[in-house]
Amino acid sequence: MSVILRNDYGAIAVNKGVIERMIIDDLLDIGDEIILCTKKGKPIKDKPARFYDPSRFTDPDYFDAVEVYEKKQQVRVKVFIITAFGSSISELTDEIFRRIENDFAILKLNNPGIITVNIKGVMSEDQIVRRNIEVIRKNV
């Protein structure tokens, strides 16, 4: 499935898997502050494999952490994460928003209409405490 992005020059179709892969790669670069998770808050991996590492394959479970879809002629992005205890939610979400918008700029696309970061839990030393915090950025 592809996402169709429209601008003054016409329409561009980009495979949503390409955008999701770029976003996941950026999320993995953030480091120990986040763990990618599913919609229900289940952690995907403790030490995920990198996409650009030729010795490893892409695990399809990673794609459960990111949703890219089109609604009302806007691209929308949802990200599902678990944060580390003590990390600043505002700083962390701002960094995620900036990286996602940068990915769209690399592809010469308009910023997504809505970016949503769903924080499904907070990880302490030995357990994950469930949370359901949603931080939204609207680009109009």
What are these regions (language model features)?
Residues E101-D103:
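Acidic-enriched and Gly/Ser
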Residues M1-E95, I106, N110, T116, ...:
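Contiguous, often N-terminal, cationic amphipathic patches that form binding interfaces
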Residues R98:
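Short acidic (Asp/Glu) patches
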